[in-house]
């Protein structure tokens, strides 16, 4: 394979991995530990 193809696949893989981790953190098990600043300031 060419170098440009490998770089493109690597960057795409990193982007997909980061997006998956962000979605897991936002909506998966760790989301229960996140604090809600709007709930803390119940005006």
From Swiss-Prot:
Organism of this sequence: Hordeum vulgare (Barley)
Protein's UniProt keywords contain Membrane: yes
Function: May play a role in photosystem I and II biogenesis.
Transmembrane stretches, start-end: 5-27
Highest taxon of source: Eukaryota
Membrane disposition: Single-pass membrane protein
Gene that specifies this protein: psbN
GO BP term (any one): photosynthesis
Name of this protein: Protein PsbN
HAMAP family associated with the record: PSII_PsbN
Coarse class of the protein's main subcellular location: plastid
Keywords per UniProt: Chloroplast, Membrane, Plastid, Transmembrane, Transmembrane helix
Any one GO cellular component localisation term in the record: chloroplast thylakoid membrane
Subcellular location field: Plastid, Chloroplast membrane; Plastid, Etioplast membrane
